[in-house]
A protein has these predicted regions:
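Multi-pass alpha-helical membrane architecture of UbiA-family
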Residues: 1-160
Length: 160
């Protein structure tokens, strides 16, 4: 719905999805904490980044239907840069989660390094003049990121 009104619909989608980890945190810990909000912010940035990448495939349909998106408004080259910046901010948020009160350690840090590497790989697949690998980047790489980071967190919390 927001695509009818603003090019920043990617943000609203990210905000909607970020409610899940914050809500899970509240359900388990019965509090909203700085840590839960950092996790939510990381999810927002992750979703913004990959939704912008995927929206590059829809640029012509968006224009034909007078819908708004970052790629439609700013062009594919700028959209790719904005997606990369969003993913970089996500990694920063994930690194801030290493604060001492969160009790995550070196295994989690290795997971964040893997996520950062996968995001760089994801962005290397997509070129402004060749969007043929967007689906692979969107579905495969992001699937590995989500399951991989969860696995590293579980190992760090349970076995280390």
């Amino acid at each position: 719905m927001t695509k009818r009104f603003t090019a920043f619909s990617h943000f609203w989608l990210g905000l909607a999805i970020s409610i899940a980890p914050v809500g899970a945190w509240v359900a388990i810990r019965e509090e909203i904490s700085f840590t839960s909000l950092l996790l939510g912010a990381a999810v927002i940035c992750w979703l913004i980044g990959f939704d912008i990448l995927y929206a590059c495939l829809d640029i012509e349909a968006d224009r034909a239907n007078r819908l708004h998106s970052i790629p439609e408004r700013f062009g594919i080259e700028t959209a790719l840069k904005m997606a990369f910046a969003s993913h970089a901010v996500m990694v920063v948020f994930l690194l801030v989660l290493l604060e001492p009160t969160v009790l995550l350690g070196w295994v989690y840090l290795a997971g964040v390094a893997l996520v950062a590497g996968l995001l760089v790989y994801e962005h290397s697949l997509i070129k402004k003049d060749d969007l043929s690998k967007v689906n692979m980047a969107f579905f495969n790489v992001n699937g590995i990121i989500s399951i991989g980071l969860m696995a590293f967190v579980i190992v760090d919390c349970v076995w280390v």
